[in-house]
Amino acid sequence: MAQRYRIETQQYNEAFSDLESNCNEITFVNKGQAVYLNGVKMDNGDAIMIGGNAGEFCTTKFACVPSTPGNIEVYVIKKIYS
């Protein structure tokens, strides 16, 4: 049986420390200076996708900080079941 879901996209221009995923899949795309996502370095143009199987629900909290002082440009894309 098909399940309904929606896609949410959010742009972040400042560091964040407790972004709750609360979704089935989440993707981070860095379009600015280098950042650290939960300790993993992401350079400009890098993307990290965390996928889930049908029925799974991720509750991980994510933190994103710039590698040097300044603003960031990170896009967060979530797949959320209705």
State the predicted function of each range.
Residues 29-44:
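Short, surface-exposed beta-strand/strand-loop-strand elements in extracellular ectodomains
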Residues 35, 69-79:
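Edge beta-strands of jelly-roll/beta-sandwich modules across compartments, strongly enriched
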Residues 2, 17-18, 49-54:
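Catalytic phosphate/metal-binding cores of nucleic-acid and nucleotide-processing enzymes, i.e., regions
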Residues 10-12, 40-53:
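Tight coil/turn sites that cap or link beta-strands
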Residues 1, 81-82:
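Short intrinsically disordered terminal tails
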Residues 22-26, 56-72:
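Noncatalytic modules at the cell exterior or secretory-pathway interfaces
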Residues 4-21:
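Surface-exposed ligand/attachment interfaces on beta-rich extracellular proteins
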Residues 1, 40-44, 69:
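Exposed regions on extracellular, virion, or secretory-pathway luminal proteins
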